[in-house]
Curated annotation (Swiss-Prot):
Compositionally biased intervals (Acidic residues): 286-295
UniProt keyword Transmembrane present: no
GO molecular-function terms, A-Z: ubiquitin binding; ubiquitin conjugating enzyme binding
Recorded superkingdom: Eukaryota
Keyword Cell division: yes
Gene from which this protein is expressed: DON1
Start-end of Basic and acidic residues biased regions: 224-244, 315-331
Name this polypeptide is given: Donuts protein 1
Gene3D superfamilies: DNA helicase RuvA subunit, C-terminal domain
Native species: Saccharomyces cerevisiae (strain ATCC 204508 / S288c)
Length: 365
């Protein structure tokens, strides 16, 4: 009985150990052992396929190696930078900076102008950072589309007008206000402008109107200045003529006063026209002689004044000058001689025959 029990225990221990080995073998599903036997073909086909991670790792490594070979070298970057037009522009803008530094900055900025320019600007003057820097973010098309086209045209027109009138020294604020009103009226009639051709035409027309108004204002100012000058000249001329007339009037008054003082009224005779009056004919030569006597008396009075003597004419001379011509037997005699005009004969015998018939004819006619 005892031997049988021992044999049964040994058999049980062998069975348990065999089961343990099978469990260990079954836990490693990824490994295939040659000692493993499959009972059926279906179980072999249903078993999972094994993967080889080492093989996959080697395949990944080959891909990374190919990518590393595709990267450019420093020489490739330098050669690509040297072909850029930006390099020439930066050399012109910063002649004091070394070429290698400019190329290095272009490589760092990946060939973009704005960051390269700003970095070189800081390098050239690090203490003075007052220069204008280029914007790093370019303006997109969407941002530009938000701006109204009419506003851009107005700004361009105003800039052109300010440039034109600043050279002429004219204040363009009034003109700009007029243009703004005109643009508003045009916008009401035309509406929002979309095509660039119509925008250009409107801009040119408004600009021409503004320039024409500016020239008209200049011409009106010049005309007003010229009219003022001409008016001043005419006023001066009128004043001069009034002064001349007043001086002539004063001289005439002096002559009349002088003649009244001397109790003589000057008689003017038109010698070119024939006279029917007998006394005009008789006084044809007396007026000239009286003028000569007046001149002589004036000169004598002036000499007496200079000598300090009396300037008054004696009464005897005045009486002789004021006396009427007297009749004489020798014919008609004037105050200055006999028959001065040559109308009467000098013989006294023929006086009644020649003078009286003429008087009768004059009385009857």
């Amino acid at each position: 009985m005892g031997k049988k029990n021992r044999k049964g225990k040994e058999n049980n221990a062998a069975k348990t150990s065999f089961l343990k080995v099978e469990n260990i073998k079954n836990t490693n599903s990824g490994l295939e052992l040659p000692s493993q036997d499959y009972t059926n073909v279906e179980e072999k086909e249903s078993s999972p396929k094994t993967d080889f991670p080492l093989i996959t790792k080697e395949h990944v490594n080959t891909k990374t190696d190919s990518n590393i070979l595709d990267y450019p070298t420093i020489g490739d970057l330098v050669s690509s930078v040297e072909k850029l037009c930006v390099l020439k522009e930066l050399k012109i803008a910063f002649p004091e900076v070394d070429d290698t530094l400019i190329k290095a900055i272009l490589i760092a900025s990946q060939g973009v102008l704005e960051p390269a320019f700003n970095s070189l600007l800081y390098y050239s003057s690090p203490e003075e950072n007052t220069d204008f820097a280029l914007p790093m973010k370019p303006i997109s098309v969407e941002d530009y589309s938000k701006i109204n086209v009419s506003e851009i045209l107005q700004r361009e027109i105003f800039d052109d007008i300010e440039d034109e009138f600043s050279g002429q020294g004219i204040n363009g604020s009034m003109v700009i206000s007029k243009i703004e009103s005109e643009l508003s009226s045009l916008a009401e009639h035309i509406g929002n402008i979309s095509t660039p051709g119509s925008n250009r035409e409107v801009a040119e027309s408004t600009r021409n109107v503004a320039v024409a108004e500016g020239h008209n204002t200049i011409l009106s100012n010049e005309d007003s200045i010229l009219k003022g000058k001409e008016k001043g000249k005419e006023e001066e001329k009128e004043k001069g003529e009034e002064k001349g007339v007043n001086s002539l009037k004063g001289a005439a008054v002096k002559v009349v006063a002088k003649s009244l003082k001397n109790n003589r009224i000057p008689v003017t005779v038109k010698r070119n026209e024939p006279s029917n009056n007998l006394f005009d004919v008789l006084n044809c030569d007396e007026s000239e002689e009286e003028e000569e006597q007046d001149v002589e008396t004036n000169t004598s009075n002036q000499e007496r004044k200079n000598q300090g003597g009396n300037t008054e004419v004696p009464e005897a001379q005045r009486d002789s000058a004021d006396r009427l011509p007297a009749k004489d037997d020798g014919g008609y005699k004037s105050a200055f001689g006999t028959d001065s005009c040559g109308l009467f004969a000098a013989d006294a015998k023929d006086e009644k025959k020649q003078v009286h018939p003429s008087r009768q004819e004059l009385s009857f006619t």
